[in-house]
A protein has these predicted regions:
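Hydrophobic, aromatic-enriched alpha-helical segments typical of multi-pass transmembrane helices
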Residues: 1-211
């Protein structure tokens, strides 16, 4: 398997894994941090499985974009590709950090010595903040990546869709609160990102990207 096809598979499979987990995400219906903690604690085994699969997907698409931007560094708009690659390097440890904090949340719920609500809720909130930071760096990388691909004469619709997804991630980083509007914007941004990333993966797999 060529590097380009391996990259393509990561971009296709990566977004699909978290998407499959959303229907069974433990705290999807929670309206507060306390409710989220309770939902996770009600089934710690399911929560562990869901978080693990989802974060494998997160790591997959970040690795896919990392490999893609690495391959784009030579040639037209190579400087932008290099910066995009650096943004992805910065986002990778944040995904690991978020996963670790979510596992720590589950462990804290199960441990009577550290199961104080304030501790558990703080862990969960910090894990979410790490996810926001990931979105910022990944969003910048996607906007730059879209620019590079467009400079390589890749389909204009695809690059525009990818750029919009990146902008959505950047904007979502600066939105705060638990309002329905904020949640809706975040959900729509994630769906848009997932579909655009899969589309990039399909183009790469079919050798439609000029690398």
């Amino acid at each position: 398997m060529t590097l380009q096809r391996f990259t393509a598979l990561l971009l296709i499979i990566g977004p699909i894994l978290p998407f499959l987990m959303f229907p069974i995400w433990p705290s999807s219906d929670a309206e507060s941090t306390a409710e989220s903690v309770k939902a996770i604690g009600d089934n710690t085994t399911l929560s562990t499985i869901v978080f693990t699969v989802a974060h494998l997907g997160f790591a997959g698409f970040v690795t896919g974009y990392f490999l893609l931007t690495k391959q784009l560094q030579n040639g037209v708009a190579g400087g932008a590709a290099t910066v995009a690659n650096a943004m992805l390097i910065l986002s990778a440890p944040l995904i690991v950090l978020q996963f670790g904090l979510r596992l720590a949340t589950i462990s804290s719920i199960s441990d009577p010595q550290i199961s104080e609500p304030i501790i558990v809720e703080t862990l969960l909130v910090v894990s979410g903040t790490a996810g926001d930071a990931t979105g910022l760096f990944a969003g910048i990388a996607m906007v730059l990546g879209a620019y590079v691909l467009r400079q390589r004469n890749v389909n204009a619709v695809l690059t525009t869709v990818l750029a919009i997804a990146g902008i959505g991630f950047i904007v979502d980083t600066f939105l705060s609160g638990n309002s329905d509007l904020v949640d809706t914007i975040g959900f729509v941004t994630w769906i848009w990102f997932s579909l655009s990333t899969i589309a990039v993966g399909v183009f790469a797999y079919r050798n439609k990207l000029t690398i």
